[in-house]
Amino acid sequence: MTEPSTLAELEEKVRESIGVRLFTVLAWIPARRALHRAHSSHPEQYPVGGEKTVEVAAGWLDRCIEAKEPYFGPNPAAVREIFADHELIESLHCGSIINVPVLGEGDVVLGVLNILDAEDSYDDESISVARSLAPLAAPALRELVARLSVQGSRT
């Protein structure tokens, strides 16, 4: 099992430090090139356990997963350019996004924090703060990735 209280506590730390309307934590499953939702502030719209494979533009995967760098979309145009679910994102009054990779031992990508708020809510300082908080998700994601990898090898 993941540690939902840990991820919920991380959500609160993000809320207190930079603000957030929509917060999800996704585990990276390399064997399937899929992102598996481990935590969601909006479980009706973004249910825990949901997976994304082709919803995200290749440039985003190159940046966040391959290069292990944050993605920053300051406004709705940037969100629309990258995310297929931009209409749902906009319906939640989110127009600015920070995606931060969560790294494990050996700089292996364990997953991604998705932090969204109103347009122009974030800046370079927000990205730095988000990066500093990302390691707090590593224990829960490490456990989830290991469990999902074992399940995937049995199918």
Language model segments and positions:
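Sensory-domain boundary capping and coupling elements
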Residues: 103-117
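Amphipathic alpha-helical coiled-coil segments that mediate homodimerization
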Residues: 2-25
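Juxtadomain coupling helices with adjacent low-complexity linkers
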Residues: 7, 117-155
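GAF sensory/regulatory domain recognition
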Residues: 25-48
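Short hydrophobic/aromatic beta-strand element in the GNAT-like acyltransferase core
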Residues: 22, 86, 99, 112
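Regulatory sensory and allosteric helical modules in signal-transduction proteins
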Residues: 45-81, 90-93
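A short, aliphatic-rich beta-strand micro-motif
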Residues: 96-103
